[in-house]
């Protein structure tokens, strides 16, 4: 009985949380889709570790240690990723893509603005960004080019903060 009561309380809390986020004119079906989509975004956070220097050494492709083989991402040997990252799908696509991540932060900012902004800043850290300033595209080819959706998502998150009465100049 105590277990059922606790579960009932958590369900009521979740219902209240998502009700606050749902537009008042949304139908019951639209509200459920929104709730499930946002819950899916929260569920898709994953610990991600990829040490390119080590990976390139294992494939005899590290230009720093004299590797001779050609390999994808050979120019990203500086990269060591080890963080909790929002993934497109933890099962089918368990790696990040900066393009997807930028769009994830737009939805995530509705439920966890700090995590959303941290994700945007993460891609600009020295253990992610290339020395030439390029944001990594995705694991299979970090050097692919993406349109400036990262800048768009950053501005969007800043404007969302401002609309809630907060102005984080340091974030922008």
Language model regions located:
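Contiguous transmembrane helix-bundle modules in multi-pass membrane proteins
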Residues: 10, 15-22
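Substrate-binding groove/exosite segments of carbohydrate-active enzymes
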Residues: 22-170
